């Protein structure tokens, strides 16, 4: 059994997500992941800004509430930082040429692969979501994250962290 729930807030396109996995037969550990980017693959791999795993024993149910609350409290500051970073990126205009240069740069850094380039370009030129039509760094970020959805499960979180770090380094430069 697995799933992800995202809590939306009124002032942001971002939402705090909680992912979970469990098994009835104790064949895998109970897992909870929390953050702005949470992924639970159908092979039950679990990643997030914060991930907590607990061996599935007969007493695991007494610990689940505490594990979940602890994960949520610890992830709030990371989530608030992502929200703050998003607001900063929204204030940085980006032309098509700047987006194409950055696209080449992140490809060169190995954040995206060749199959993702057309996806990023399409999402940049014709965003799937109206909220990303503005020509700014935030829209570019979301074009890239749309392409990252096709990443192999074992590298999706690493790639999300890499694009976030790379674009925030761009902001600081």
Which residues does each PLM region occupy?
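Intrinsically disordered, low-complexity regions enriched in serine/threonine
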Residues: 6-173
């Amino acid at each position: 059994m697995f799933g992800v729930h995202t809590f939306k807030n009124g002032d942001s396109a971002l939402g705090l997500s909680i992912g979970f996995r469990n098994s009835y037969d104790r064949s895998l550990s109970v897992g909870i992941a929390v953050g702005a980017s949470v992924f639970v693959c159908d092979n039950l791999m679990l990643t997030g800004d914060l991930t907590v795993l607990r061996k599935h024993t007969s007493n695991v149910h007494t610990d689940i509430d505490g594990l979940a609350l602890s994960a949520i409290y610890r992830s709030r500051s990371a989530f608030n930082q992502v929200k703050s970073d998003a607001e900063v990126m929204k204030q940085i205009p980006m032309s098509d040429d700047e987006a194409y240069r950055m696209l080449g740069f992140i490809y060169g850094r190995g954040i995206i692969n060749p199959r993702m380039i057309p996806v990023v370009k399409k999402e940049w030129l014709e965003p799937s979501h109206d909220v990303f039509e503005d020509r700014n760094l935030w829209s570019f970020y979301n074009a890239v994250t749309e392409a990252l959805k096709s990443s192999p499960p074992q590298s999706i979180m690493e790639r999300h962290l890499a694009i976030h770090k790379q674009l925030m380094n761009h902001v600081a430069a």
